[in-house]
Amino acid sequence: NSAAASDVYKRQPDNAFVQNEVSNVDATIGKEFMLKSIVALVAACVLILLYVAYRFRRIGGLKAGSTAIVALLHDMLVVFGVFVILRIPLNGNFIAALLTILGYSINDTVVIYDRIRENTGLYGKKMSLPELVNLSINQSFGRSMMTSITTCIALAIVCVVSIIFKLDSIFTFAVPLLFGMVSGVYSTMCIATQLWVSYKTRKAAPAPK
């Protein structure tokens, strides 16, 4: 804290100390931080659910939104895991990284859902649902990968620069974000769409006699 820093300055006046960052951690701040974090994330997820459910009501609506939220929860767990494994403090960078990944991942999901909706009108009666979804993913794969690779390269450069110049605050934001970006591509193609297909297929299956 500031009192401890002042004491060090007085005891060693000949040394040029630089105070880069000050963090206060106590039970009250921890509770307030977690509460605000949970409120922000829940609000973001609810808004995303409503948006996806309304925009893609022709292909499942609420179920499409629910499967997208499951994929987003996966991405948030990945980001949280990176913070825990690297022992990065859960501060403002944590929430910023989570909210950034939410926006990035849902963008990929919306692109593929939009392609599924379009292909449903074109090939809905000519292809099975798994084939239609597979076609939609293949059509969106190139764009998603190019966007992700470009973003990951930029983040990797930021990570290297932050290590060289010892910019801890930037490093603790960029590294979890890098892993979250990769997770977002995976969850969109392998979790959200597959859960949606499973739901639609199970719903369309005849009830056992």
Locate each region found by the language model.
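Single conserved hydrophobic/aromatic residue that forms the stacking wall/gate
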Residues: 1-9
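Internal alpha-helical transmembrane segments of multipass membrane proteins
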Residues: 34-74, 78, 82, 149-161
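Hydrophobic, glycine/alanine-rich multi-pass transmembrane helices and their short helix-loop junctions
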Residues: 51-54, 146-196
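Short helix-capping/hinge motifs at transmembrane helix termini and TM-loop junctions
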Residues: 55-59, 86-88, 161-166, 200
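Hydrophobic transmembrane alpha-helices and their membrane-interface caps
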Residues: 62-115, 121, 165, 179, ...
